[in-house]
From Swiss-Prot:
Organism for this UniProt entry: Oryza sativa subsp. japonica
SUPFAM superfamilies given in the database record: Mss4-like
Subcellular location: Cytoplasm
Family matches, as InterPro entries: Mss4-like_sf, Mss4/transl-control_tumour, TCTP, Translation_control_tumour_CS, Translational_control_tumour_p
A GO cellular-component term linked to this record: cytoplasm
Residues of the TCTP domain: 1-168
Family (UniProt): Belongs to the TCTP family.
Protein name (record): Translationally-controlled tumor protein homolog
GO molecular-function terms, A-Z: calcium ion binding
Keyword list, A-Z: Calcium, Cytoplasm
Pfam families xrefs: TCTP
PROSITE patterns: TCTP_1, TCTP_2, TCTP_3
Length: 168
């Protein structure tokens, strides 16, 4: 299994259990998330509760919770939305911090294509949700989520150059 960690913080953000598609010249990875239900496990042990005097409301009060699989699996923490100025400020800092961690070839590729990816994200800014890794480190990468037209499940966007592949 492969896990993808934030290159700046070491937080686990993704794994190969969630296939990705490269967009914006490979700078962004697009990953489909899904809403899943956790809790409220209904175990059928073969007993007939009505014959035993039991009702539907008997037993443990177990609450089902809907979560997004990627957010739950990697314990992503949602952040307040950014306005355009805040986003541009974040991107400048992120580009500077990430570029310092990349080798020369990756750095050149990143700097060549990051402007297009930034414009792509700016075009979706009002529709994006922002997430950081579990450590909630300020200088780490962001994970973006949005809903495509008519979709009920979110699509996540990752900066590919900001991820480090780790074999587990």
């Amino acid at each position: 299994m492969l896990v993808y960690q934030d290159l700046l913080t070491g937080d686990e953000l993704l794994s190969d259990s969630f296939p990705y598609r490269e967009i914006e010249n490979g700078i962004l990875w697009e990953v489909d998330g899904k809403w899943v239900v956790q809790g409220a496990i209904d175990v059928d042990i073969g007993a007939n509760p009505s014959a035993e005097g039991g009702g539907d409301d008997e037993g443990v009060d177990d609450q089902a919770v809907k979560v997004v699989d990627i957010v739950d699996t990697f314990r992503l923490q949602e952040q307040p939305p950014f306005d355009k100025k805040q986003f541009v400020t974040f991107m400048k800092r992120y580009i500077k911090n990430l570029s310092a961690k990349l080798d020369a070839e990756k750095q050149e590729e990143f700097k060549k294509n990051i402007e297009g990816a930034t414009k792509y994200l700016l075009g979706k800014l009002k529709d994006l949700q922002f997430f950081v890794g579990e450590s909630m480190h300020d200088d780490g990468g962001l994970v973006f989520a949005y809903y495509k037209d008519g979709a009920t499940d979110p699509t996540f966007l990752y900066f590919s150059h900001g991820l480090k592949e780790v074999k587990c």
